[in-house]
């Protein structure tokens, strides 16, 4: 099964550009690791650099942090180029921070979903918790500036409005999210999710 997974036919229609890039990036990341173990350092650096470019382009935050960490070590030990080392170190710090912020947003999102859907908690309790989380996450959204962070944060914001039956506030928030996410052209599933929410919110407003 492991061997088969390395030879997936990503030319099939089910794979969009981002899915293809995801598979290729992780495959190449593993290949570069193997080259490092075999002391083929320059070849490993070349593959890591190429993969890093794709990981940044398609917003694979965890992978970007991992690749930049490996490159940071390789440039520190092998290349003797302080400019390259500082460039990669900066990318590593930036994406470790993004990774941390995404994890914070995910934890708040999962906690709230547990109250909102699983426990079926009273609306006042959900509204209070959603407001607390949103007010923590929203001001630092630009520091993260990732699609996943925006998704978790704005979904929490929507739950805050829904729990207070505030349709107008929810619609304004969805429109704000879509305005930000339209720049993230490789995250169509998240854009579609908020677009669907926007359409569903227009109907009750139109019937008031």
What positions do the PLM features span?
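Flexible inter-repeat linkers and adjacent short helices
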Residues: 1-131, 144
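Structural signature of alpha-solenoid helical repeat junctions
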Residues: 23, 59, 63, 149, ...
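Glycine-rich, often proline-containing surface loops adjacent to acidic residues and nearby aromatics
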Residues: 26-28, 149-158, 197-200
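Residue-level signature for tetratricopeptide repeat
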Residues: 34-35, 54, 72-74, 115, ...
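The canonical alpha-helical register within tetratricopeptide repeats
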Residues: 50, 90-91, 136, 176, ...
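N-terminal low-complexity or simple alpha-helical regulatory segments
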Residues: 77-80, 88-94, 137-163
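Extended non-membrane alpha-helical scaffolds
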Residues: 161-208
């Amino acid at each position: 099964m492991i061997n088969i997974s390395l030879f997936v036919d990503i030319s099939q229609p089910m794979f969009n550009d981002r899915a293809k890039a995801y598979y290729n990036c992780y495959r190449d990341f593993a290949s570069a690791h193997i080259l490092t173990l075999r002391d083929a350092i320059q070849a490993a650096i070349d593959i890591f650099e190429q993969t890093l470019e794709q990981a940044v382009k398609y917003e694979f935050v965890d992978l970007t942090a991992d690749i930049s960490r490996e490159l940071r070590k390789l440039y520190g030990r092998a290349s003797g180029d302080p400019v390259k080392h500082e460039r990669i170190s900066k990318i590593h710090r930036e994406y470790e921070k993004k990774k941390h912020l995404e994890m914070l947003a995910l934890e708040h999102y999962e906690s709230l979903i547990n109250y909102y859907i699983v426990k079926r908690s009273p609306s006042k309790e959900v509204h209070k918790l959603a407001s607390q989380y949103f007010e923590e996450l929203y001001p630092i959204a630009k520091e993260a500036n990732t699609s996943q962070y925006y998704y978790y944060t704005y979904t929490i914001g929507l739950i805050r409005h829904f729990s207070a039956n505030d349709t107008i506030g929810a619609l304004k928030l969805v429109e704000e999210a879509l305005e930000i996410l339209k720049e993230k052209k490789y995250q169509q599933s998240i854009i579609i999710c908020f677009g669907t929410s926007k359409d569903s919110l227009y109907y009750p407003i139109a019937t008031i």
